[in-house]
From Swiss-Prot:
Plays a role in the inhibition of host innate immune response to promote latent infection. Mechanistically, suppresses viral DNA-triggered signaling by impairing DNA binding and oligomerization of CGAS. Also impairs the translocation of host STING1 from the endoplasmic reticulum to perinuclear punctate structures which is an essential step for its activation. Regulates the function of host NEDD4 family ubiquitin E3 ligases through its PPxY motif and thereby prevents the excessive ubiquitination of gB and its degradation by inhibiting these E3 ligases. This is Protein UL42. Interacts with host ITCH; this interaction induces the ubiquitination and subsequent degradation of ITCH. Interacts with host STING1. Interacts with CGAS. Coiled coil: none annotated. A motif (PPXY motif) lies at residues 16-19, 42-45. It comes from Human cytomegalovirus (strain Merlin). Late-budding domains (L domains) are short sequence motifs essential for viral particle budding. They recruit proteins of the host ESCRT machinery (Endosomal Sorting Complex Required for Transport) or ESCRT-associated proteins. Contains one L domain: a PPXY motif which is involved in the interaction with ITCH, a member of the NEDD4 family.
Length: 125
């Protein structure tokens, strides 16, 4: 009967795999291939792999833009046609916000100064 792995003697344990074995690498030797015979035909042409495979979804827009002729690309200003509307709206909201804050601070300061003046007049009279 085979002893359980926990009870086996450490001397009989298998050695851990080497780095090459663990990574699935085999030792390779670098050597130049022999020159082809003079009557040998060249290998058949294979297109590059990037043209054979389909592009990933995130590059689809770039690919579509590349397929269009340069004269048909939208101008840079076309991407910002609605930008001036948002800029104007933001400017109006910012100005209204500044006016609102100025009115609120003015009312609060005037209310505090009115309470102080009425309080001093009431105590002296």
């Amino acid at each position: 009967m085979e002893p359980t792995p926990m009870l086996r003697d450490r001397d009989h344990d298998d050695a851990p795999p080497t780095y090459e074995q663990a990574m699935g690498l085999c030792p390779t030797t670098v050597s130049t291939p022999p020159p082809p015979p003079p009557d040998c035909s060249p290998p058949p042409y294979r297109p590059p792999y990037c043209l054979v495979s389909s592009p990933s979804p995130r590059h689809t827009f770039d690919m579509d833009m590349m397929e269009m002729p340069a004269t048909m690309h939208p101008t840079t200003g076309a991407y910002f046609d609605n930008g001036w509307k948002w800029t104007f709206a933001l400017l109006v909201v910012a100005i209204l916000g500044i006016i609102f804050l100025a009115v609120v601070f003015t009312v609060v300061i005037n209310r505090d100064s009115a309470n102080i003046t009425t309080g001093t007049q009431a105590s002296s009279g």
